[in-house]
């Protein structure tokens, strides 16, 4: 037993790291001390495993992954799915990338990158829209799909000299000629996903750009026009400048906006006002009658929706008015003189600066059509007062003027005072006889009734 232990110790004693305390202490020193070439406490420097380079290689994929997510959030035009072969080989396989990775292709094509250029920046950028791919993009996508989904039995020569447009035109049968059914479904699904993502991104971006352009053009347009007008007043030399884009945008929007039909808006009102009822039709009502029907636009038509109209054929309008009134000698001169009568009535006005153009005042027409009281009715109310005829009638019947007036019988001498002082007229003795019947609606005040 003791011989076995001694033999084991003799074998292990060759490794001084198990017994030498100085060696163990040196193992716990910082990395900077472990790389010092002059330290005599632990063996030769070439026996130490170079840990710092390995640590840098481990941290590199993490840095690439974070930068990749940041680029995708900022609307990168790369494919929505990360097609980096070098990333997949390092993260999944954990080893060095094979000769078909994108980094080797980029190094061969453009030479070594700058020292401050990261792995993510060295990646080849593939357009998000597969229809824009070149032959090289198709080759890169195919290599990425083979390694990403572990696809086998794919004839890569079938996709040589094929760009993105030809690739998108391929159907399921075309893919089956180059690979198996499983690989065909995988490739078609990923290709369809890329196309849908690119269309959605394009529509969203175009809508956002269009709305931003509209908001930028609509808001400053008035301000730009106002500044241009102010500048023209201050400096006449600015008149030579080209027209502003904002003003052109406003004019185009105004022209493109559909104008309302005046016959639909003013038609019902014209028909209602043109109906004279049982009386004779007037000239302004006759014009409204013509304007209520768009078939008469050859001789008279509306000019907008504010009541303005124009006689396109004034002689025809005068002729029709003469037929209606049985006046064959009617012409436009007589018609225009008749229209002047309505200026003071606030029924219509003449539009200045335009020939044969007039404008109806519908508010004035509504006031003109309201019934006004006549002069006889204004003086009917005083004659209808009830106490006037009854007063004169009762004066004859009751005999308000007796031959010998007497004093008013009151209970208090301070209420009216002396009768002769208050009633100075001979009618001071009102109702001297208490047996006289009282008549309603007389001029006697109500507060005197309690004394009789």
Curated annotation (Swiss-Prot):
SUPFAM superfamilies the record matches: SAM/Pointed domain, Winged helix' DNA-binding domain
Pfam name, any one: SAM_PNT
Assembly mode: Can form homodimers or heterodimers with ETV6/TEL1.
Matching CDD domains: SAM_PNT-FLI-1
Identification of the protein by name: Friend leukemia integration 1 transcription factor
Gene giving rise to this polypeptide: FLI1
GO terms under biological process: animal organ morphogenesis; blood circulation; cell differentiation; hemostasis; megakaryocyte development; positive regulation of DNA-templated transcription; regulation of transcription by RNA polymerase II
Basic and acidic residues bias (residue ranges): 215-226
Family per record: Belongs to the ETS family.
Phosphoserine modification, residue list: 39
